[in-house]
Curated annotation (Swiss-Prot):
Keywords: Metal-binding, Ribonucleoprotein, Ribosomal protein, RNA-binding, rRNA-binding, Zinc. Its cofactor is Zn(2+). GO terms for molecular function: metal ion binding; rRNA binding; structural constituent of ribosome. This is Large ribosomal subunit protein bL31. GO terms for cellular component: ribonucleoprotein complex; ribosome. The gene is rpmE. Part of the 50S ribosomal subunit. Gene3D superfamilies: Ribosomal protein L31. Zn(2+) binds at C17, C19, C38, C41.
Amino acid sequence: MPKAGIHPRYEEARIVCGCGAIYETRSTKPGVTNVEICANCHPFFTGQQKIVDAEGRVDRFLKKYGNVQPRTKR
């Protein structure tokens, strides 16, 4: 039997995903917890690849460091 008064309360909780899926569970953190991705919308589980905007990052990198010349030995 666990000691009385030292364990957190284990209450009803709701997990809400960005895709609209809602999961009812129990947790020591009661209330609503919002998550960005879940098993219903994660590419690993759905088999669909989402295209990430990596081109913007590459362009930003090249804009910042693209014209830098390599250092020469002295």
